[in-house]
Regions:
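Alpha-helix N-cap/helix-initiation sites
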Residues: 2-3, 32, 54
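Short amphipathic alpha-helical interface segments
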Residues: 2-18
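A broad, structural micro-motif
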Residues: 19, 59-61
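Short acidic, hydrophobic short linear motifs in intrinsically disordered regions
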Residues: 19-27
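Short amphipathic alpha-helical interaction segments
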Residues: 29-44
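Short, Lys/Arg-rich nucleic-acid/phosphate-binding segment
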Residues: 52-58
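Amphipathic alpha-helical dimerization/coiled-coil segments
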Residues: 66-87
Length: 87
């Protein structure tokens, strides 16, 4: 299963908890600029909330974001599990 960058970030925040943009970018394998743009989109979608502690931006899942991230992780793990069994 291929995840979009948005989906990948949601799962990263689910697994690791609140993180700075730079750490999310590193874990997702994307640039900090791309990460910032994606974080803004996730914020606009109501899936994450950000706390600004100068000069840092700490991001965490909202309740809705948590529900979606859990479901995405479950689906991706099921797909991977089924793929491995068929090899």
């Amino acid at each position: 299963m291929f995840l979009t960058v948005k989906q990948k970030i949601l799962i990263i925040l689910l697994e690791k908890g609140p993180l700075q943009n730079s750490e999310i970018a590193r874990r997702a394998g994307i640039t900090e600029q791309w990460c910032s743009e994606t974080i803004n989109a996730l914020y606009a979608d109501g899936l994450i909330e950000s706390q600004f502690i100068t000069p840092r931006r700490i991001n965490k899942l909202t309740g809705r974001g948590l529900e979606i991230a859990k479901r995405l992780k479950e689906i991706s793990e099921n797909v991977i599990s089924k793929s491995v069994r068929h090899v």
